[in-house]
């Protein structure tokens, strides 16, 4: 039996699956994955809850499976969130230093970050993250920790991630209905980036693209910090829908064809090859052209990368990603997907590998579990920052900035 005070759980309620990852944090802060639970997701559409009772059952099944594998009782989770309502932008906060000796204190840092978060969001939205980028002291830029410096004007740049309050609360309430506490909600794209990227990759500049069932989340790092985030309401399920429509087959058969014969690029060896589908559900025998199948997939996946590239170009970030692009999520399993993405994004593209996490290879080696692992990793950083801190405000002051620079 494990020491449950060191147990951290990441819970992803996705469009295609619900996944719970149990991690044990060692004394040196390292995270070891000791449990994994998953169930098919039946009540989520484009990353958002559409049938709460059904989702509740799926979450319960995933939690129970994770508990049994890890031999622990799960009480708290870090909950991943996504959806087209999630938005991100950069903002600057300003705070005058009024102490007699002009020395910048922790309170000054807390106040300037608070000012950066005081933005005019739509009434129905709430801040999910305010991620510190860089501080400025009397105009001096590139300051990572201003505490103890002398100055009269403190500024901070932050990346703000926000979402629709009710949609976020729907997920939180559902989890709490299962007698679980939500330690914190975390943007799925952020979680995935924490699982994959090293500190050096963040400094060089990197793009993480998480292709899920109903959404594609992405995060851009440059100079060690997050500069941009985005969510597309397009994912792997849309590929299956396209196949069902284009090939005139049931959705379940389209999904199977995608997994067994799919490719992001048309395989030259498949040209002219056909598949004869067996009789199913009383439907007549059907012949499928494999080249046509792969071309349908290629067009949809191409669209996803084009939309990401257009957003990066508009944000002026395309030239700052020297470490390249890292793919994860179930959609990253499609053969040839990196080869498809490279000419569109005009940089190197590879399948992401979990970084600085040990444990179950069945979880660590699969791109579809990256987000849930990242949620647990987010929690492990939070735990490390709590150690030795005397009060809640003190515990949370620098957590996000520290996490994102690791």
Give the residues covered by each predicted segment.
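Nucleotide/phosphate-binding catalytic cleft detector across ATP-hydrolyzing
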Residues: 1-17, 21-208, 225-226, 236, ...
